[in-house]
């Protein structure tokens, strides 16, 4: 029987390094280490109650959110996997108030790693897909990293990705040269390329938003969602379906495959806050991926990747997915501002 030829993550990255010359060896190794950490997180997630990792940890993160046991474990896995390899100058996590400098006894590299170790963790105990989101930046030359070193607009990302821990464990990755999806072969322990050059469909009939917050929405979102809900009898003359998983990685992964728009707008409950999702840990990496797949991502007024971060845990409104839909809801926001 002929041996089936499959492209592993390692093979893919080495080929990219040879063909495009835009993937330095240190960055390739860093991505592989992050991918290995995601495999470890996937293992613990899949153990569920058998691994004694479900439930809350009795603590809160810097966002004031109750931490799950798996939140803390996933954060530790990513820190420990990446601190010693010599590829990083520092790390920042949604679960930590301050950035994590590489310990003095380890060599330092030229990259910064930013991550949400376990996105959608409110779904852990009910066995709904959750995931890890990460972003890689260059540390300014010759600098000992400070918080300011991390505060770069999303256009400066050199790589971004997310893992989804669901029926299959998948890793979606961009290094600025398109988007590819790898599926974890649990028997071999390898990430295998299963989707190349992913493209978000331009036309869509699906949208993702938490409709329970409808009474708090601002007029541009009310107008846009109202048109979708009106269906064939409304101005869009087409029926739309709403999908909401409450796990950003799962919602975005569906949109990447089937098209649609993901929305987490600012609302009237907290008018002093520009949104709920974190610019550095969630919005920027997802915006990079979505744009590389032919989609768009804005905060309702401007391109997410152009936003200059002011703090590590800055929040932002998010509209991302199929370009035509993102452009439309963004236009409604801009018209309201006039």
From Swiss-Prot:
Coiled-coil regions, chain positions:
none
Q: Which UniProt keywords apply?
A: Carbohydrate metabolism, Cytoplasm, Hydrolase, Magnesium, Metal-binding
Documented EC number(s): 3.1.3.11
Query: Cofactor(s) for this protein?
Result: Mg(2+)
Q: Name one GO cellular component term.
A: cytosol
- Entry binding sites for substrate: 119-122, 210, 276
Which positions bind Mg(2+) 2? 116, 119, 282
Q: Which InterPro entries match?
A: FBPase_C_dom, FBPase_class-1, FBPase_N, FBPtase
Q: Which GO terms describe its biological process?
A: fructose 1,6-bisphosphate metabolic process; fructose 6-phosphate metabolic process; fructose metabolic process; gluconeogenesis; sucrose biosynthetic process
Q: Where in the cell is it found?
A: Cytoplasm
Which SUPFAM superfamilies does the UniProt record give?
Answer: Carbohydrate phosphatase (SSF56655)
Instruction: List the pathway annotation.
Output: Carbohydrate biosynthesis; gluconeogenesis
Positions of Mg(2+) 1 binding: 94, 116, 118
Cofactor remark = Binds 2 magnesium ions per subunit.
Q: Which family does it belong to?
A: Belongs to the FBPase class 1 family.
What does the subunit section of this Swiss-Prot or TrEMBL entry state?
Homotetramer.
Q: What is the name listed in the Swiss-Prot or TrEMBL entry for this protein?
A: Fructose-1,6-bisphosphatase class 1
The scientific name of the source species is Paraburkholderia phytofirmans (strain DSM 17436 / LMG 22146 / PsJN) (Burkholderia phytofirmans)
């Amino acid at each position: 029987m002929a041996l089936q030829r499959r492209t592993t993550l390692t093979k893919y990255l080495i080929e990219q390094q040879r063909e495009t010359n835009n993937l330095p060896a240190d960055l390739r190794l860093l991505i592989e280490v992050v991918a290995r950490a995601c495999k470890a997180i996937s293992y613990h997630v899949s153990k569920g109650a058998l691994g004694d990792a479900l439930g809350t940890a009795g603590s809160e993160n810097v966002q004031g959110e109750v931490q799950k046991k798996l939140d803390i474990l996933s954060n530790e896995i990513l820190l420990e996997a990446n601190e010693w390899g010599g590829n990083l100058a520092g790390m920042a996590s949604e679960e930590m108030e301050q950035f994590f400098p590489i310990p003095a006894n380890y060599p330092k590299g030229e990259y910064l790693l930013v991550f949400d170790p376990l996105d959608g963790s409110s779904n852990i105990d009910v066995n709904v897909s959750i995931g890890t989101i990460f972003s890689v930046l260059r540390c300014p030359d010759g600098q000992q990293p400070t918080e300011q070193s991390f505060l770069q607009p999303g256009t400066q990302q050199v790589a971004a990705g997310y893992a989804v821990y669901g029926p299959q464990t998948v890793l979606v990755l961009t290094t600025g040269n398109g988007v590819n999806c790898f599926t974890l072969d649990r028997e071999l322990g390898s990430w295998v390329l299963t989707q190349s050059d992913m493209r978000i469909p331009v036309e869509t009939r699906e949208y993702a938003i938490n409709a329970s917050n409808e009474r708090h929405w601002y007029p541009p979102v009310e107008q846009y969602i109202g048109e979708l809900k009106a269906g064939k009898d409304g101005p869009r003359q087409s029926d739309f379906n709403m999908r909401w998983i409450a796990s950003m990685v799962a919602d975005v992964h569906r949109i990447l495959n089937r098209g649609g728009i993901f929305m987490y707008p600012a609302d009237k409950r907290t008018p002093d806050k520009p949104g709920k999702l974190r610019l550095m840990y969630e919005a920027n990496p997802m915006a990079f991926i979505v744009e590389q797949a032919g989609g768009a991502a804005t905060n309702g007024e401007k391109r997410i990747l152009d936003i200059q971060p002011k703090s590590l845990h800055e929040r932002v409104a998010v509209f991302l997915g199929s370009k035509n839909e993102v452009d439309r809801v963004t236009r409604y926001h801009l018209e309201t501002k006039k």
